[in-house]
Regions:
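A short, surface-exposed alpha-helical micro-motif characterized by mixed small hydrophobic
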Residues: 222-224
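ABC ATPase "signature
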Residues: 237-241
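ABC ATPase NBD coupling module
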Residues: 75-98, 116, 124, 131, ...
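Conserved ABC ATPase "signature" region
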Residues: 72, 132-150, 259-260
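Short catalytic/signature loops enriched in Gly
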Residues: 3-4, 78, 145, 152, ...
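Conserved ABC ATPase signature
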Residues: 155-159, 163
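A short, proline-enriched helix->beta-strand linker immediately N-terminal to the Walker B motif
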Residues: 174-178
Length: 274
C-alpha cells in the first residue's frame, strides 16, 4: 500500500442554524498517494461539505466542529491544515490541493478568453513568471488536456461543454498539485464525453502522480475510475473498501441499496469495466 497523502481524523462540520445540523459526523479516512478515492452517496449526504471542509472553503453558517486534517507533503513535511493562517492557506490552495468545482464548466468568465483565465492562475501564484513564460505554460496545459493551443484565444461560448470542462481541469492542474478534488466533474455531459473525461483524468493521474478525491452520486461511474470508494450517508462514512469489494461484496445495507438502485440492461449484474 502506498504512503498516505491526506489524513482526516474525527472530522465534523455543523451548520450553525436553529436547530444546528450535523452535516459531517466524525469522519476518519486516509487518502493514499497516487490514489483515486471515490466519495459516493445521495444528494445532501455531506460529500461536498466534507470536501470543502478539508480545504477550509466552508462559508457561514457551516463551521468545523471538530477533528483534524493533515497533509503529508512530498517534501516530507506534515501540514496541519486547520493550523494554517489565512495567508498560508491561500498559498497552500492550488499549489498543494486544487479543486474542480461542481458546475465548473459554467464558471468560466464569458467575456475573457480561456488563455487569459488560465494565465491568471500563474499571475497570482507565480508572480515571478513573465508574460512569455505564462503563455508557454498555458499552451502546454491546453495540449495536455487535449483542447489544443490553437484555442488559447477562444471564448468559453466557442467551446463545447466537454472542452470547457477540460479547461477547468487544466486550471486545476496548472500548478501541479499533489491532490485534486473533483466535485461532480462530469455532470451535464453526455455519456460519450463523460467517458472521455474519465479516461483523461485517469491518464493524467498516472502521468503526473497526483491523487484524486472524486465526488459523485453516480456509483457505477465511481466503480470504473476509483481505486477505493467511500460510501457516505447522513454525514457519516458507512463503508470504505476497494471498488472491486464494493461491487462484488458490499457489507453495508445502504451500499447494497445504492447498487440495486441503478437499472441494468440485463436482469443480472454486468461486468465491472476498469
Amino acid at each position: 500500500m502506498s504512503e498516505p497523502l491526506l489524513s482526516v481524523r474525527d472530522f465534523s462540520v455543523v451548520y450553525d442554524v436553529d436547530p444546528p445540523v450535523e452535516a459531517v459526523k466524525n469522519v476518519t479516512l486516509e487518502l493514499h498517494r497516487g490514489e483515486i478515492l471515490g466519495l459516493a452517496g445521495e444528494s445532501g449526504c455531506g460529500k461536498t461539505t466534507l470536501a470543502y471542509g478539508v480545504q477550509r472553503l466552508l462559508r457561514a453558517p457551516a463551521v468545523i466542529a471538530g477533528g483534524g486534517v493533515t497533509f503529508h507533503d512530498a517534501s516530507g513535511v506534515d501540514v496541519d491544515i486547520n493550523a494554517l493562517d489565512v495567508e498560508a492557506m491561500q498559498r497552500f490552495r492550488w499549489n498543494k490541493i486544487s479543486m474542480v468545482f461542481q458546475g465548473a464548466m459554467n464558471a468560466l468568465n464569458p467575456v475573457a478568453t480561456i488563455g487569459s483565465q488560465l494565465e491568471d492562475v500563474f499571475e497570482i501564484h507565480r508572480p515571478d513568471m513573465n508574460r512569455r513564460q505564462r503563455r508557454a505554460e498555458v499552451e502546454e496545459l491546453l495540449e495536455i488536456v487535449k483542447v489544443g493551443r490553437q484555442r488559447i484565444a477562444s471564448f468559453p461560448h466557442e467551446l463545447s461543454g466537454g472542452m470547457r470542462q477540460r479547461v477547468m481541469i487544466a486550471m486545476a492542474l496548472a500548478l501541479r498539485p499533489q491532490l485534486m478534488v473533483m466535485d461532480e466533474p462530469t455532470t451535464a455531459l453526455d455519456v460519450l464525453v463523460q467517458r472521455e473525461i474519465l479516461k483523461q483524468i485517469s491518464q493524467l493521474r498516472h502521468e503526473f502522480g497526483f491523487s484524486v478525491i472524486f465526488i459523485t452520486h453516480d456509483l457505477p461511474l465511481l466503480l470504473e475510475i476509483s481505486d477505493r470508494i467511500a460510501i457516505m450517508r447522513e454525514g457519516e462514512i458507512v463503508e470504505l473498501a476497494t471498488a472491486e469489494q464494493i461491487w462484488t461484496d458490499p457489507q453495508h445495507e445502504y451500499t447494497k441499496t445504492l447498487l440495486s438502485s441503478f437499472p441494468r440492461l440485463t436482469g443480472e449484474r454486468g461486468v465491472l469495466t476498469r
